[in-house]
Amino acid sequence: MGLPWYRVHTVVLNDPGRLLSVHIMHTALVSGWAGSMALYELAVFDPSDPVLDPMWRQGMFVIPFMTRLGINNSWGGWSITGGTITNPGIWSYEGVAGAHIVFSGLCFLAAIWHWVYWDLEIFCDERTGKPSLDLPKIFGIHLFLSGVACFGFGAFHVTGLYGPGIWVSDPYGLTGKVQSVNPAWGAEGFDPFVPGGIASHHIAAGTLGILAGLFHLSVRPPQRLYKGLRMGNIETVLSSSIAAVFFAAFVVAGTMWYGSATTPIELFGPTRYQWDQGYFQQEIYRRVGTGLSENQSLSEAWSKIPEKLAFYDYIGNNPAKGGLFRAGPMDNGDGIAVGWLGHPIFRDKEGHELFVRRMPTFFETFPVVLVDGDGIVRADVPFRRAESKYSVEQVGVTVEFYGGELNGVSYSDPATVKKYARRAQLGEIFELDRATLKSDGVFRSSPRGWFTFGHATFALLFFFGHIWHGARTLFRDVFAGIDPDLDAQVEFGTFQKLGDPTTRRQVV
């Protein structure tokens, strides 16, 4: 037929058997990619330090999704939460990857079978003997089956009734583990950060899907609606399917970027808004304040801050700091975090405690400014030394560390004080190994950023695809040039394949 590349899909237009075949092959490709990608990530993943080198710092993309659905262990003898295990069971990371690859192979064979045996009786209309699909009936079947799957996931997998549960954590991403979740049927179920809403919404949506599927199986659409929405045209199915996909892509781009119970920070990294709002910093100061009220010393109070919490409060873990065209995991940027140096507290010679202004998300450089508790500028690192009034040397700034590796260590020489003031702009200070991976020191985004960018971009493209195919199916007669003044009556729709010369014409 000599089709251009952008019209090749017309070969399956009136061919239900091969239409099914290419969709099975697509499923094979998706499943095969998922399994292969999982095996690749497992080959390069280092599980040795779940606190300072978690999966999201290493750029893992499919491992977090497996983990949030209840996979914890590897046949390599390690657990995602740290430590070793002896019996990971069949549903380990490798087991899930293998299952996807086996399923991919079966789909591949099924796709070939359906391509070869395309002319099946099931696809023939009994009345005409021609290939046809009862699209409203197929819609009902798919709606019913997806409703069953949705209900089953919410009622069994998430609740732990028959399944592992899902990943659940505290608001600060410290205590995450896989556990069963009870459905939240009250108003709290609509809070995107409440895991119970995942169970209840899947149960409710699944029930609705089952009922809607049964409705569409038992009730035929009215003729006027059938014709008005072009329910007999496969391109209508394409258009509405694209709409469902782009809508879902927009939704998950939002839940990923802004955060939700479905995107735990232990698996995907923190969100940019947690840096912007000082979310972890406030919790750290609250814990230190509680410790001081219990008569602990500054050193004791800061030493009790979990290293994991301090690590979240570091700008290098902000997904908005990495450029879209900086490839690679976060560890390839600022390096592999080795340890927390401790919290630096700066003081001037008059005894004021000074706080370094933190760098906003979208700055690459930022002036080093130290303010007191009232927000008054007391010291800085000046751009022009000749005009400086608040330089570290003039004000006599010193720094002392509390907690971490440098606990109790203080510095008064200006060069060292300025070094740590610059680093304090970026949040809590960590020792970073840039040699192992030859890290270049330029921040990278986390999988949270990549997922959001990819899904938002493709959602936009698919939105245009929905408009395109929706317009094509609604206005097919107009686009085909069939108008009231046409002097040859075309039996339109019998043969739609491009270049087919056999469409019957009858001169009026």
From Swiss-Prot:
One BP term from GO: photosynthetic electron transport in photosystem II
Protein name as annotated: Photosystem II CP47 reaction center protein
Similarity comment text for this entry: Belongs to the PsbB/PsbC family. PsbB subfamily.
Organism: Chloranthus spicatus
One GO MF term attached to the UniProt entry: electron transporter, transferring electrons within the cyclic electron transport pathway of photosynthesis activity
Record text on cofactor binding: Binds multiple chlorophylls. PSII binds additional chlorophylls, carotenoids and specific lipids.
A single cellular component GO annotation: photosystem II
Subunit and interaction comment: PSII is composed of 1 copy each of membrane proteins PsbA, PsbB, PsbC, PsbD, PsbE, PsbF, PsbH, PsbI, PsbJ, PsbK, PsbL, PsbM, PsbT, PsbX, PsbY, PsbZ, Psb30/Ycf12, at least 3 peripheral proteins of the oxygen-evolving complex and a large number of cofactors. It forms dimeric complexes.
One Pfam family named in its UniProt record: PSII
Function per UniProt: One of the components of the core complex of photosystem II (PSII). It binds chlorophyll and helps catalyze the primary light-induced photochemical processes of PSII. PSII is a light-driven water:plastoquinone oxidoreductase, using light energy to abstract electrons from H(2)O, generating O(2) and a proton gradient subsequently used for ATP formation.
Gene responsible for this protein: psbB
Keyword terms of this UniProt record: Chlorophyll, Chloroplast, Chromophore, Membrane, Photosynthesis, Photosystem II, Plastid, Thylakoid, Transmembrane, Transmembrane helix
Membrane topology: Multi-pass membrane protein
